[in-house]
Amino acid sequence: MTYTVDTPRSRRRRLRWPRLPLGEGQAAWTTRALMLLAPLLSFTLVEYLNYNNPWTDFTPLQIALNLAWYYLGELFFYFVLRRRASAVKWAMGIAWGLGMANHYLISFRGRTLFPGDFLTLRTAANVAGNYDYRPDSMQWLTIGVFAAVLLALSFLPNEKKRPFPWRLFVPAAGAAAVYLGVFFGTGFVESRGIEPSMWKIGRAHV
């Protein structure tokens, strides 16, 4: 008679998280599609938290300028992590987190987060206890969407870390440099009647 010893390792094998049976090529195209679509969803969630409808409240130029930041952030994480699914998770998570912070700031102060606010963190910490931080229905909706995205990503096959993609990095870095130069170093944005620090805050204009 033989006996099977139930070890922690064997239990982990039985409880392995299910993965989609995708081939290497299928998984690659799936993560590429996610990298293309995720910034659109991130932009929608963030602007929804800012009390805006991004697809009707903004001009096409404003939408393009906003989306550029989301794609740049995602590319940054891709070059650092060298995994497409991980880049999607980190870029979306940080964008969503900033959207949540802005949602509170708009509710409390009527405006979004500005770079100068980081210089007054001590003052902000002193008054932070005076506010109600319970999530509202808008926040719960975005929490559900973000959680659903993370759950969907968890079913993808494990992704190997790729060699650094120099062939993609060089043109991406060049395009980013041009965009940042035009955005901050010229009057192009202001000449179109757009405030670089804040496109529009729906609730602040009510």
Question: What kind of feature is each model-predicted range?
Answer:
Residues T2-G202:
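Transmembrane and membrane-interface helices of multi-pass
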Residues A204-V206:
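Conserved small/polar residues in nucleotide/adenosyl-binding loops
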